[in-house]
Amino acid sequence: MVNLTIDGKQISVKENTTIMEAAASNGIPIPHLCYLKEINEIAACRVCVVELEGKDRLITSCNNVVKEGMVIHTNSPKVRRHRRTNVELILSQHNCECVTCPRSGNCMLQTVANDLNILDIPYKMKIEKQPWNKEFPLIRDSSKCIKCMRCIQICDKVQSLNIWDVEGTGSRTTVNVSGHKTIEQSDCSLCGQCITHCPVGALRERDDTEKVWDALADPNKIVVTQVAPAVRAAWGEELGFKPGEATVGKILDALKRMGADYVFDTCFSADLTIMEEGTEFIQRFTSGELKDRPMFTSCCPGWLRFAKSQFPHLVKYLSSAKSPQQMFGAVMKTYFAQKLGVKPEQIFTVSVMPCVAKKGEQEMDLFYEEYAGKDIDVVLTTRELVKMIRASHISPETLEDRESDRPMQEGTGAGVIFGATGGVMEAALRSAYFLLKGENPPADAFRSVRAEGFNANHGVQEADFQIDDITVRTAVVSGLGNTRALLNKIEKGEVHYDFVEVMACPGGCVGGGGQPIHDGEELAFERGKNLYQLDESANLRYSHENPDINLLYEEYFEKPNSHKAHMLLHTDHLESMELYGTGYCDYSKK
């Protein structure tokens, strides 16, 4: 242990602890802007400076470790003076139109400036704004960038895509898309991790709330909404709900109050995805098609974008099943439209998702039908949902639990855990076991695929399962850097699997790029626990036991992987890549 004194308090901490960590663990927070533990420890902002007795110059606390006998002052007059100057200099190159910024009230720079009581900027403002296509799902406002380099590091070290880079020198230094490309030309997966790790409002998702307001006000539109499993684990964080209070039923109630005609839980179409994907896996596995390469899940659009740009030769091993979002849209504009006796184009489908990449998926050309338009018309992130609730002047405490509308009312625990890494695999194996043996396995028989406790540096969970005389080798991976490492091992023949689940965001959808932002906190696994608890308490825990799913097959699709199911619930990723490249629309024409 190392003994030192911080602000007059004698403390003991482990060796190699940074000064910032030592102070924080003893109730002394040191302000900072650029620091991300183990990801961005470059001390670029100089806001975390502290005074070390015996040293003339201030030192940064984020990347200097403690030493025996140190006496440190985190808020001396000298520290406050230098910290204030550093923040004023940052503000002089920052667009301070806070009222119109999506991060107002949740901005690290705003918080630090307020705490330092900065009421004026004594330096000449010098703000440059680079052009950006506002139709792209991910928006960057260069006038708000503080050059903290977080986006560069999170994309490089965690997601391995290197989309962002530093360009220019001196006062002209800025961050931009690497390789002098536009964002549309890059290999951006739209995971949104750069958004959730930006300390200010320089990065955000494209705001689509006005499209929804317009649809809600259109008497000729039937607005149908769906809410993804991961949203229920996070939306209440911004509205003051205690854990367990922010139910999906309250989201459905809020959407109804806003004017939605029908409200549904995406758990229904997650169950539908399991029936299609599980059946497909058994067919491909038993036919010997997977002897060289595993079948990969296909419900994460960030992963699909990554696969098509980085490992195009593996695209043929993707499941052909659409994601729950897209299956929902296809069912709404066919089966549900027939139930209502209306034309498909009258139905306006809105998805509430934890994800920025879902906005890109919604716009993919292969999900367009002339008779119905897009499967999904608009995607809102969890953050956009919260904005709309606030704009509707809905008091959160008045929300009540509402059931999904019929006939797609039921969802199972298997559908709920889609939102956590490992959940898709576990849900699929529960039903695959039934399809192979004709009986249910214990509900928790496959829980070893859950990636409990792993982080951005170790994101792979492996498990083998014996079903009679069949051994199924599985792997679960989240985070695209981890995914790249795993795929390279598969390519080299170092590991062998039959079925692999991939999620672009560390921790799965609960850690998605559209979720509420808590600076410096990684909450994916805490949110995931919430979903697993909901599964454990669910009345139904197997997708194949969902009565509304069985009714849908009886009335419309006949059986999983039927011809009609393939027409509406599946897609050919290889063909779509040949026709559309990565599958996203051409934003240059929008």
Task: Locate the predicted segments by residue.
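Short, well-ordered turn and helix-capping elements at secondary-structure junctions
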Residues: G8-Q10, G179, F336
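A short alpha-helix capping/helix-coil boundary motif
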Residues: M1, P131-W132, R172-T174, P229-A233
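Fe-S ferredoxin-like electron-transfer domains
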Residues: R46-L190, T196, L203-D218, I222
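A generic secondary-structure micro-motif detector
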Residues: K9-Q10, V99, P131, E184, ...
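Eukaryote-biased recognition of intrinsically disordered, low-complexity regulatory segments
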Residues: M1-K9
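Iron-sulfur-associated redox domains of electron-transfer enzymes in respiratory
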Residues: V13-N75, V79, R206-K590
